[in-house]
Regions:
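Single transmembrane alpha-helix segments in multi-pass membrane proteins
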Residues: 24-86, 109-116
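Structural signal for alpha-helical transmembrane segments and their membrane-water exit/capping regions
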Residues: 18-35, 62, 133-137, 176-182
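Alpha-helical transmembrane segments within multi-pass membrane transporters and channels
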Residues: 87-126, 169-172
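Structural signature of hydrophobic alpha-helical transmembrane segments
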Residues: 14, 38-50, 89-99, 164-165
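Membrane-helix/interface signature in polytopic inner-membrane proteins
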Residues: 173-196
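Hydrophobic mid-bilayer segments of alpha-helices in multi-pass membrane transport proteins
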Residues: 13-22, 164-169, 190
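Transmembrane alpha-helical segments of polytopic membrane transport and secretion proteins
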Residues: 1-14, 34
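Transmembrane helix-bundle core of multi-pass membrane transporters
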Residues: 114, 118-181
Length: 196
């Protein structure tokens, strides 16, 4: 393998190689790391982050930045938990995605209509959204220990956490959209040349 090919390979697969090395090291250091229970816990704990990262694929593919994704997640979570405790758990579950959608739409308007660079727009909205989330929660954890509300994160199907199933479904749908639809081709086209 030539030096150029080696560099190209490392650029494309460096993250996967590092993850593999980390898994090997952790397996050698701990007998309990490479167990089904631990791996399921890792997947469950990282499912929300993986879903956000998958969604960020769309933003990055069109050549944008979204630094407010964490704040939007916080707003959706706080809204959902507050509604679950004070109004109705199902209303909390139903409205959380729409909160995220509305805030993301506001970002999109700031970027496309007001022509604010995505980096600056999302830094500003991140501060605003995070401030609202802290104000609504009064800076404290909102504990929603309601069975009808917590089944999505703590419940299991076929021995696997429901959140992991949601993550896998989300990844499959997004992969299909990006690789097999006109929408996906347009996303990559905009990322290649916004003016076109």
């Amino acid at each position: 393998m030539t030096r150029a090919k080696t560099l190209h390979f490392l650029q494309n697969y460096a993250v996967l190689i590092l993850i593999a090395l980390l898994v090997v090291a952790l397996t050698l250091l701990s007998d309990s790391f490479l167990t089904g229970r631990n791996l399921l816990n890792i997947l469950n704990q990282n499912a929300p982050l993986a879903i956000m990262a998958a969604a960020m694929t769309l933003v990055i593919s069109v050549g944008g930045f979204d630094l407010s994704v964490g704040a939007i997640f916080a707003m959706g979570s706080v809204t959902s938990a507050w509604l679950a405790v004070n109004v109705d758990p199902y209303l909390g579950l139903l409205l959380a995605p729409f909160v995220g959608l509305a805030l993301g739409y506001a970002n999109g308007l700031a970027i496309t209509v007001l022509r604010v660079h995505s980096f600056l727009a999302t830094i500003a909205t991140a501060l605003i959204f995070k401030g609202i989330a802290v104000a609504v929660s009064d800076g404290r954890l909102i504990s929603a220990r309601i069975d009808d509300f917590t089944w999505l994160g703590r419940g299991k199907f076929l021995g696997v956490f429901n959140s992991v199933w949601v993550m896998v479904l989300f990844a499959l749908v997004l992969t299909f959209l990006l690789t097999r639809t006109t929408f996906g081709r347009r996303v990559f086209a905009v990322g290649g040349n916004e003016e076109a």
